[in-house]
Regions:
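Beta-propeller folds
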Residues: 1-11, 37, 49, 69, ...
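Alpha/beta-hydrolase fold nucleophile elbow
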Residues: 105-118
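Short glycine-enriched nucleophile-adjacent loop
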Residues: 118-131
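Hydrophobic residues in well-ordered beta-strands that form the structural core
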Residues: 66-67, 115, 139
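Accessory cap/linker subdomain of secreted extracellular hydrolases
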Residues: 60, 128-187
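N-terminal cap/lid segment of alpha/beta-hydrolase-fold proteins
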Residues: 1-34
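Loop/turn elements at helix/coil->beta-strand transitions in domains of secreted/extracellular proteins
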Residues: 22, 35-38, 61-64, 107-110, ...
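Cap/lid segment of the alpha/beta-hydrolase catalytic domain
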Residues: 30-103
Length: 187
């Protein structure tokens, strides 16, 4: 029997979406050959250090953990427009990612999603698309309405989120729009 704590990490694993755009993931999986349940988290953040602690925890306990960059930021291809490709439009990156993960040789076909904030919102957009292999979703928190102008969201989190988005935006028009929103918030 393989020790539970033995796992491997495959970096920058490509998956091709329905429109031909390639998104990249870091895949943490048990070292022992086999087919395992998969947990997917889709983010617009750098994958390395943010996901490692709990990705390793899940992989060492018999799960495959897929941390994927959304379309556009970091290694993933395509134009980055926040949340535009996560739901039920022409490009359904969330749906395609779930079905891609289910078809991999290390997957037993049971795929779940997890986490909050950006990842929580991508789950909210994924849910109505109903991928056949999506068995569970764990959203620990995500804003229902990103544009609210009340409370802590407006005071602290919203400007912080916008600054993070500017740093990660690769499309000039998206970056300019975010800058104008930050200027409005700070005035």
């Amino acid at each position: 029997m393989t020790e539970l704590n033995e796992f491997v990490i495959d970096r920058k694993v490509p998956s091709v979406m329905r429109d031909g755009t390639t998104l990249y993931s870091d895949v943490y999986r048990p070292k022992a050959e086999g087919r395992y349940p998969v947990i997917v988290e889709r983010v617009a953040y750098e994958l390395d250090h943010r996901l490692e602690p709990y990705a390793e925890w899940y992989a060492s306990r018999g799960y495959v953990f897929v941390g994927q960059n959304s379309r556009g930021p970091f290694w993933s291809e395509g134009e980055w427009v926040p949340f535009a490709d996560d739901g039920w439009g022409e490009r359904q990156d969330g749906y395609d990612t779930i079905e891609w993960a289910a078809a991999q040789p290390w997957s037993n076909g049971n795929v779940g999603t997890m986490d909050g904030s950006w990842s929580g919102h991508t789950q909210n957009l994924l849910a109505p698309t109903r991928p056949p292999h999506l068995k569970a979703m764990f959203e620990r928190m995500a804003p229902a309405r990103w544009g609210d102008n009340e409370g802590i969201d407006n005071i602290m989190l919203r400007p912080m989120l916008l600054k993070q988005l500017i740093i990660q935006a690769q499309h000039p028009s998206a970056s300019a729009e975010l800058r104008s929103q930050i200027e409005e918030l700070e005035s």
